[in-house]
């Protein structure tokens, strides 16, 4: 990772206390990709990181499990624009439900939490649902105790997840790729959750409705790449970081705005999400003047 006299992002990512209070930096316009699986790029990782740095795409790199997070930590050392975060995806929950003390160690060192959540739709094995719920509550309780934001997968578990956020007073939550009921969407909005709009906004009228419903101050963008486009289009397309530009343009069209306005709005919202975050001091220096 490039080192700089004014910013030591790696120290913050490792949970170390590093800050230079009252030191202003020039605010730089950035795209925000608030949910990505960078460890899945394989041989295309160098190209992906090149796009992230060249196009100034701040990237929240979400983990699926412990090996995923360890790989993301290494990737995060290569770019100050990558935030590695630890989580256990609901598909992996059954593998980790009896290993909570081990997970606690990684939660402690991760500056934010994700990907976590419930998947009671695409995961057909209902015997895994109790493990999903136990893992999720463990992470949300820890996020509340440690004051960390969470990045949530909510498919068919939207109301349960909202109830846990309320129970543990976790106010800084990113709801990733929301596609659930509109009434629960409104409840989550009322609670103050942020929502990422991703590549499906280019193809789905329902997602367009969601993109148009989320209030300005809670809007974020994502790609969920490299696999989201492949999953949506049922082809072999590998989604690269630059796809976030198409997402921004599509969101702008839906909201009758401009790409520049949406980019600025999303950056401001992400800055608000991390404002006063004790774990992300250096990131605030990077992102705001």
Regions found by a protein language model. Name each.
Residues 2-289:
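Mid-domain alpha/beta scaffold segments of enzyme catalytic cores
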